[in-house]
A protein has these predicted regions:
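Extracytoplasmic/secretory soluble proteins
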Residues: 8-568
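Bacterial N-terminal signal peptides that target proteins for export
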Residues: 1-8
Length: 568
């Protein structure tokens, strides 16, 4: 079922309409373990009387790589100054972060705190991570958020067969769609297309036709040749990790299928059919066939560069900034950098950039439906090394770092008075960077000579601030971004969240054994279909057979058996 979205723009409070309904269970805060040698509490700064060191993993993104200053004078030093906790950082390249933490967990050498985890399922059966749900009664900030925003139904979706969950997720008051598509509005207008009118009811098919017209215009003006592609996207190649990344995720959701980044943890594109009350594989459905035909049409007709699915993000961005392409993916963190890069290369006044509410397919659903996002695991090594009381102290520090308003603001904006302060705009008290600062991570641009607080000190990085209330998660939104979310509310809908089948450890292990090669096969075939290496009509049956040979039917059968058993 779908829920229509209406919009209230006061502080983007429209987003509260995304909140899912459910039971009224309350998180119980027992507080029956005395805090010896440290202070903690709901919106109380965690502080250890004696210096303490906790190890933590770090997903290091090349486009804002961790610098020594982050530890000596930036975010990590700020945390230590406030809490007396020194974070011993083990840094892994973001491209193979999951593989590296997997190796560390399996070898017993994992850090105590493991953030930036999207899918905890591969780590549960081995016993290398703690069932964190056993400790949430010691987490006052986490528990207060769960109670205030009725998060228990959402948390139920990540519980395992044993009734526990092993990842402390980022929790949103409301689901927010981050990734979308932006275009060179000036070129669309010159070609005779009003993108602001088109987006009100456009589809991927109609976008295809519009782009054919835009390319025809560009060829006539000598801006490109018939052999050139006018769309060469990012977050699909190296960062897409062989799945098609962001583009196939948002496009796939438009056709009620799982693809791209969404494929991770899906056991082969498994979705729930609410009419039949059973699970099926969307990856071998007619919807999937429709989706890849549409995606392929962009490549086949000379619009979308097949290098989209192999190139680095920098290459894709440079093609757009130099004017070789006129459409690409973006998100809130990238918008200001996109604007600044176009201004630097093309010159102010020589372009118009428009961030769209991306097209629909057979539905108008946004790709994001869950109020949960990536989160934090705690290793069994931490419990073994620290003992129960020491581990609970660690848990209370994590509660402050990831769930308190104070730490959220610090990790996102930096210290008040150093990088930002409050200002009053139209009678509203808002956060604003101080003169001389900008931040790509917040979508706040500036001069070339301004200091980017993410690059310099590590604020607004992707490792440590997740979720929170709508007011907090949108406190950096520019008027343009607020306008985008208003248009989402007008033109898009949100699908209900699928229920979860909760396998036992043995069942999970079996599903993983089947799912890994199956998903690799699905991803490989999908990219071959889209790039034209395989013919969708003549090779479709071979593709479906290959999925059956890799146990897609067994996965569906076992998933439905698990779900039937838990819903008796």
């Amino acid at each position: 079922m779908k829920k229509n979205l209406s919009v209230l723009i006061a502080g983007l409070c429209f987003a509260s309409l995304f909140v899912s309904c459910g039971g009224n269970k309350k998180a119980e805060v027992k507080g029956d373990v005395e805090a010896k040698g440290y202070t903690f509490g709901e919106e109380v700064t965690f502080h250890s009387d004696e210096p303490v060191t906790y190890s933590i993993s770090f997903s290091d993104a090349s486009w804002y790589a961790k610098q020594p200053e982050w530890e000596s004078e930036g975010i990590f030093k700020d945390i230590e100054n406030l809490t007396n906790v020194h974070l011993d950082i083990t840094s892994y390249d973001s491209g193979d972060y999951n593989q590296k933490i997997n190796l560390a967990i399996n070898s017993g050498s994992a850090t105590y705190i493991i953030p930036k985890v999207y899918d905890e399922n591969p780590y549960v059966a081995g016993g290398g991570v703690v069932a964190v749900s056993d400790y949430i009664q010691y987490m006052p900030n986490f528990s207060a958020f769960v109670e205030k925003y009725n998060m228990n139904p959402d948390l139920d979706t990540i519980r395992q067969n044993d009734g526990k969950f092993y990842r402390l997720p980022g929790m949103h008051q409301a689901a927010l769609q981050d990734y979308t598509i932006e275009v060179r509005e000036d070129i669309f207008e010159a070609a005779g297309y009003n993108i602001r009118e088109l987006e009100k009811d456009w589809t991927w098919e109609s976008l295809h036709d519009v782009l054919l017209g835009v390319k025809k215009y560009m060829v006539s003006q000598g801006m490109c040749t018939e052999k050139d592609y006018i769309w060469s996207d990012l977050w699909c190649g190296e960062s897409g990790k062989g799945t098609g990344g962001n583009l196939l995720k948002i496009m796939g959701a438009s056709y009620n299928v799982i693809s791209g980044w969404a494929m991770d943890g899906s056991n082969g594109g498994i979705k729930f059919d609410p009419a039949k009350k059973e699970f099926y594989s969307s990856s071998v459905s007619e919807d999937y066939k429709k989706f890849i035909k549409v995606a392929n049409s962009f490549v086949k007709n000379g619009i979308l560069d097949p290098e989209t699915f192999t190139q680095s993000d920098d290459v894709a961005n440079n093609k757009f900034y130099s004017g070789k392409t006129v459409i690409k993916s973006t998100n809130r963190s990238s918008m200001s950098n996109d604007e600044a890069s176009l201004a630097k290369i093309l010159g102010e006044g020589n372009y118009k950039l428009y961030v769209t509410a991306y097209p629909s397919g057979t539905n108008k659903n946004l790709a994001e439906t869950s109020r949960l996002e990536c989160g934090v695991m705690l290793s069994q090594k931490a419990l073994d090394d620290l003992g129960t009381e020491g581990f609970i102290k660690l848990v209370r520090f994590v509660d402050w770092m990831f769930y308190s308003k104070e730490a959220y603001t610090l990790c996102k904006w930096g210290p008040q008075g150093k990088t930002w302060d409050y200002t009053e705009v139209d009678g509203m008290k808002i956060k604003q960077l101080l003169p001389g600062f900008k931040c790509g991570g917040l979508g706040i641009g500036g001069k070339d000579t301004d200091t980017d607080i993410r690059l310099k000190w590590g604020y607004a990085g992707g490792n440590y601030f997740y979720g929170h209330s709508t007011a907090e998660s949108t406190d950096n939104f520019t008027p343009a971004v607020q306008d985008l979310y208003a248009r989402y509310g007008k033109y898009k809908t949100v699908a209900s969240v699928d229920p979860k089948a909760k396998p036992s450890e043995d069942q999970r292990e079996q599903l993983n054994l089947w799912a890994v090669p199956l998903q690799d096969n699905i991803n490989a075939w999908t990219l071959k279909f889209i790039t034209g290496q395989k013919n969708i009509d003549s090779d479709w049956d071979e593709y479906v057979s290959s999925c059956k040979n890799l146990n897609v039917e067994k996965i569906v059968k076992l998933t439905n058996e698990i779900y039937a058993a838990q819903t008796k």
